[in-house]
């Protein structure tokens, strides 16, 4: 993914939409996709069930740390309404990944990670029927991880606003400048360089990519320079951005199938109602004719 910085998230999604030509006669319940993100089994049944398996965070020895099942249960308890599975499946897999990162000894919250999650979440939930529900799900999700949803949103917005004022050179040259955002990057670089209090994750990689996109960076070498300045492994970032791009493509296909399914159900329901109305009219006319004899 050498030229990853020249491709925007919106361009990825639009490209996937052009490529997704899925037959409407295909059963939506059998549609599945797999990626290295472990997001799979997408269909349109509403589901709020939680997995029975329990995954313990082996990177910490604290006996009182919550399990994955605890975190998922907390999320489902906070948001009780059914979520269409095309969204819920990815959310459930994502919360597993984020739980395991969240409870590592080396984990420390940072705004780039928050920007990455907000970006992924907003891409995933784009087109969700209710904005109110979308916000409620976000709140329940972050609070299930014992973090602050308002901080996630505020920090993501702050980074986005800053990135829009940057260019390729100023984005990389943060170490020679003073400022709130520059100090955040310096702190990340220091922690990543000493391996003390820094936990790299795929969401962090997405956060970096989002910064480059907002700064209108088209030079593919800038990502490499930014990774070097932050003491982050460029190969890991490239790999994880490839996975995310694949996820976006699969989500477009799944949502298209969901849309087709809903439209077919509406059509069937309309046909049934029309048939029922015709039968009622016919019966009434028959009764009227019989009564008039």
From Swiss-Prot:
One Pfam assignment: ThylakoidFormat
4Fe-4S listed as a keyword: no
Biological process annotations from GO: photosystem II assembly; protein import into chloroplast stroma; protein import into chloroplast thylakoid membrane; thylakoid membrane organization
Recorded coiled-coil stretches: 240-273
Membrane topology of the entry: Single-pass membrane protein
Transit peptide feature range: 1-45
Topology Cytoplasmic: residue spans: 221-293
Disulfide bridge partners, by residue number: none
Domain of life, per lineage: Eukaryota
Keyword Chloroplast assigned: yes
Signal sequence segment: none
InterPro entries reported for this sequence: Thf1
Function: Involved in a dynamic process of vesicle-mediated thylakoid membrane biogenesis. Required for the normal organization of vesicles into mature thylakoid stacks and ultimately for leaf development.
Name of protein: Protein THYLAKOID FORMATION1, chloroplastic
């Amino acid at each position: 993914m050498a030229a990853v910085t020249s491709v925007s998230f919106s361009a990825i999604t639009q490209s996937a939409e052009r490529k997704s030509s899925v037959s409407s006669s295909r059963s939506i319940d059998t549609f599945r996709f797999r990626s290295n993100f472990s997001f799979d089994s997408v269909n349109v049944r509403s589901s709020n069930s939680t997995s029975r398996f329990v995954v313990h965070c082996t990177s910490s020895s604290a006996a009182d740390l919550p399990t994955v099942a605890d975190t998922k249960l907390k999320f489902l308890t906070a948001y009780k309404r059914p979520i269409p599975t095309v969204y819920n499946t990815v959310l459930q897999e994502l919360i597993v990944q984020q739980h395991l990162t969240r409870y590592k000894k080396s984990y420390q919250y940072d705004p780039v990670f928050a920007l990455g999650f907000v970006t992924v979440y907003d891409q995933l939930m784009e087109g969700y029927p209710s904005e109110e529900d979308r916000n409620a799900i976000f709140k329940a999700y972050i609070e299930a991880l014992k973090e602050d949803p308002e901080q996630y949103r505020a920090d993501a917005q702050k980074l986005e606003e800053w990135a829009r004022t940057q260019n390729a050179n100023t984005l990389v040259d943060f170490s020679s400048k003073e400022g709130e955002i520059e100090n955040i990057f310096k702190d990340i670089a220091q922690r990543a360089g000493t391996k003390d209090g820094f936990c790299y994750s795929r969401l962090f990689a997405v956060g970096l990519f989002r910064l480059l996109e907002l700064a209108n960076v088209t030079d593919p070498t800038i990502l490499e320079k930014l990774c070097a300045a932050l003491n982050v492994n460029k190969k890991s970032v490239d790999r994880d951005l490839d996975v995310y791009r694949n996820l976006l493509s699969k989500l477009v296909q799944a949502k298209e199938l969901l849309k087709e399914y809903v439209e077919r159900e509406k059509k069937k329901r309309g046909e049934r109602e029309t048939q029922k109305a015709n039968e009622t009219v016919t019966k009434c006319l028959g009764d009227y004719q019989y009564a008039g004899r």
